[in-house]
Amino acid sequence: MKFPESLKGLKILVLGGGISGNSALDFLISEEAQPILCDRNQPETISVPFFHDNIDPRSFFEISLIIKSPGILPTHPILSYAVEKKIPVFSEIDLGRFFFKGKIIGITGTDGKSTTTSLVAHLLKKDFSDLKEGGNLGIPFTSFCKEPISLAVLELSSYQLEDSSPLDLNVSVFLNLAPDHLERHETMENYFRAKLKIADLQNPNHSLIVSEKIREKILNSTSVQCKLLSFGRATTSEAILDESSSEIRTSKFIYDISRFYLPGTHNRENLAAAILASEAIGGKPESIQAQIPFFMGLPHRFQIAGEKRGISFINDSKSTNLHSMLAGMSAWKNLDRTCLILGGRPKQEDPKPLYDFLMRGIGCVVLIGEARSVWEKGIRNVIGEKLFSVENLDEAFKIFKKWNVISESPEIRKIRLSSEITISYFVFSPACVSFDQYKNFEERGNHFLSLVEDFLNNASWT
């Protein structure tokens, strides 16, 4: 499907509001199109015609094309009608791609997309001072696609890729693959295929950067026409992660990562991918190296939420599946003194890796939300009385306030649950989506931060 050369005067249906849909609306208005919004919720103020999304699709017989928001299911009746009537359907990313004149780095994967997107943008600041980052990160592509900038760094979800036409990206990054969003994609193969669309239309001048763990799967699944570069610990990788010497080696440079701020092997793998992407787009190794120590990460991704006299709280609200939580906790060295706060609405994942992880000697677990009905029995079978099951975060902090703060020294405190359990670290890494109690993971994380602040300001520290 080809995009129209001009949108002026065209009747275009935006199916689904939200961040990307509303940005597409604003862009279409600026291009003098005649957009129509169709959504389940009517905005309080709107300057274009609005229809509820249960309207008879035949009402849209004069529509030239549809811009579909990523949250809309492919089975929506309006999309079925579009297929029947051969009405072109594009994504908001397609719309931005058609009008953008610069280069694009696209980043996908099950976990680490947002961090790696921001990391790439950070590493390239010196060489591409006008670059912008966006996409699924929360800044819609159409909000800046007509600006005269040289580079866009886009986080691309499986929903966005599934909806998009071939994007012809200069550099694509496929970080990792684990079960996720199967309620939408139904099978792992469908999910993988949606992710793999990031490499569509890439030519020999372009680069596809992948984890060594999925390199063979990709080679066996598609005909790769571009340069395929891998990252990992294997000596055959184009970016070799050597954790013993705190180095990442490429054909162009040996990068010192000893001062890289983010903890965990998964974050160093993200850094290796970001370095390869930065080199592939034209970043100078010396400039990339200079930026590495100054990346502080993103909110709600293993963020220090508060510390006081040796007791620390970690906010990892962005952890929305088991794979993400386990990756983040894999390098944690203080399990026996850690209270892990889990829960929310679990995804369709095998919980056995969670139970295996907890058997390594966790201090205790606080389980909240809908996950209690799914995981409580299994967790209790593993850790027994070290599990505390409560409805929500507020109830969790009520429990924390009842536990005894003990003095190890004038400067150091710990929280004692019993003679066997003493806690120094509270890690909120839910491994679940937030929709049972919150609008999104940001709202959930901000609530956790406010509870931590209240706890640290009001707990007895004598």
From Swiss-Prot:
Record keyword Cell wall biogenesis/degradation present? yes
List cystine links. Answer: none
The pathway noted for it is: Cell wall biogenesis; peptidoglycan biosynthesis
Q: Which InterPro entries match?
A: Mur-like_cat_sf (IPR036565), Mur_ligase_C_dom_sf (IPR036615), Mur_ligase_cen (IPR013221), MurD (IPR005762)
- Record keywords, A-Z: ATP-binding, Cell cycle, Cell division, Cell shape, Cell wall biogenesis/degradation, Cytoplasm, Ligase, Nucleotide-binding, Peptidoglycan synthesis
> What transmembrane ranges does the database entry give?
none
Catalysed reaction equations from the record? UDP-N-acetyl-alpha-D-muramoyl-L-alanine + D-glutamate + ATP = UDP-N-acetyl-alpha-D-muramoyl-L-alanyl-D-glutamate + ADP + phosphate + H(+)
Q: Which GO terms fall under biological process for this protein?
A: cell division; cell wall organization; peptidoglycan biosynthetic process; regulation of cell shape
Which EC class does it fall in?
A: ligase
Cellular component terms per the entry's GO annotation = cytoplasm
Q: What Gene Ontology terms describe what this protein does at the molecular function level?
A: ATP binding; UDP-N-acetylmuramoylalanine-D-glutamate ligase activity
| Amino acids binding ATP | G109, T110, D111, G112, K113, S114, T115
Where is this chain's protein located in or outside the cell? Answer: Cytoplasm
What EC number is given for this enzyme?
A: 6.3.2.9
Organism superkingdom? Bacteria
The record's section on Pfam families has: Mur_ligase_M, MurD-like_N
Principal cellular location given in the protein's record: cytoplasm
Entry similarity comment? Belongs to the MurCDEF family.
Q: Kindly give the HAMAP family that the UniProt entry links to this protein.
A: MurD
> What function does the entry list?
Cell wall formation. Catalyzes the addition of glutamate to the nucleotide precursor UDP-N-acetylmuramoyl-L-alanine (UMA).
Q: Which PANTHER family match?
A: UDP-N-ACETYLMURAMOYLALANINE--D-GLUTAMATE LIGASE
Q: What is the protein's name according to its record?
A: UDP-N-acetylmuramoylalanine--D-glutamate ligase
Q: What organism, scientifically named, is this protein from?
A: Leptospira borgpetersenii serovar Hardjo-bovis (strain JB197)
